[in-house]
Amino acid sequence: MKTFPVSIVTPDGPVYEKEVEMVSVKAESGEMGILPGHIPTVAPLKISAVRLKNGGHTDYVAVSGGFIEVRPDKVTVLATSAEEANHIDTHRANEAKRRAEQRLQDKQAHVDFKRAELALKRAINRLDVSNMK
């Protein structure tokens, strides 16, 4: 099957750069599957896993928002943060989850609940993706 280059980039630099047959992402508008020759598109991403298929193998990358830019010959994900499944520190992710849950349970006025909810979603996503290795 035909392949195309995919780059997943964060403000800290590239996280993933390979040729793949298909990319699946969760955009704000819904799930997107991208094959070679896809029409040009730009879409905001949810906190989720990016699935990258090549042959019988699938790579998973946890992304925390950002955008996907699709061109007929290349796909670029510009993510706020991103980690490949095999690089996720599950101990750190569990600690972040615990802290976010604690902040959400505190009924104090100074707690930013939206920020705590996003931290919880990011931690859960990282843990889910780490199990997809």
Swiss-Prot record:
Entry superkingdom: Bacteria
Pfam families: ATP-synt_DE, ATP-synt_DE_N
Keyword Flavoprotein: no
Cellular location(s): Cell membrane
Membrane topology of this protein: Peripheral membrane protein
This protein's UniProt keywords: ATP synthesis, Cell membrane, CF(1), Hydrogen ion transport, Ion transport, Membrane, Transport
Gene Ontology CC annotation, any one: plasma membrane
CDD domains in alphabetical order: F1-ATPase_delta
Main location: membrane
GO molecular function, one term: proton-transporting ATP synthase activity, rotational mechanism
Family: Belongs to the ATPase epsilon chain family.
Assembly description: F-type ATPases have 2 components, CF(1) - the catalytic core - and CF(0) - the membrane proton channel. CF(1) has five subunits: alpha(3), beta(3), gamma(1), delta(1), epsilon(1). CF(0) has three main subunits: a, b and c.
Annotated NCBIfam families: ATP_synt_epsi, PRK00571.1-3, PRK13446.1
UniProt function note: Produces ATP from ADP in the presence of a proton gradient across the membrane.
UniProt name for this protein: ATP synthase epsilon chain
Organism from which the protein derives: Bacillus cytotoxicus (strain DSM 22905 / CIP 110041 / 391-98 / NVH 391-98)
